[in-house]
A protein has these predicted regions:
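Conserved N-terminal beta-strand and adjoining loop/helix that marks the start
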Residues: 16-37, 58
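The catalytic Nudix box helix
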Residues: 54-86, 125
Length: 153
């Protein structure tokens, strides 16, 4: 490991050798209702199977994050949403890939969410978050949500 200075600045950036990863851009929905947040359990046979996450998916080439999210929610949950503001962004590297994930505040506009491409759906309160296991890429968001009670209303 080396430390290198950034010219003109008084701080240092840790420089390490990293493996080249496949970069994946993901949009995820934060859907709140009655002080509860919608989460989905990842199906078996996929990366991070069995962990809980926020509904959404991979962005296709030429697609906006907002359009991606609307498409993914229709495909995975059979319901419509309005995509609101960007709440949080995180870039996380796993051993096999790097995930650039953007979390948007969303509202249900059509239908009731159904578990089409996930094992299960749950509406959880802020106090129940610790009872579920989430991917590492979601941990920073969960810490942020813990500090933002106004989002749960």
């Amino acid at each position: 490991m080396r430390w290198r200075s950034l010219s003109g600045h008084r701080f240092f950036v840790k420089s390490t050798t990293m493996r080249k990863h496949t970069a994946v851009e993901v949009a995820a929905a934060l859907v709140f209702r009655n002080e509860k947040l919608l989460i989905a359990r990842r199906p078996s046979g996929v990366h991070l199977a069995g962990l809980w996450e926020f509904p959404g998916g991979k962005r296709e080439q030429g697609e906006s994050f907002e359009s991606c999210l609307q498409r993914e929610i229709w495909e995975e949950l059979d319901c419509g949403i309005t995509v609101g503001s960007l709440v949080f962004k995180n870039v996380h590297s796993y051993s096999e890939k790097t995930v650039d994930i953007r979390f948007y505040h969303c509202k249900l506009t059509q239908g009731e969410p159904r578990a089409i491409e996930c094992d299960a759906l749950e509406w959880i309160t802020k106090d129940q978050v610790a009872d579920y296991s989430f991917p590492e890429a979601d941990v920073a968001l969960l810490e942020y949500l813990d500090r933002c009670p106004h989002l749960w209303v």
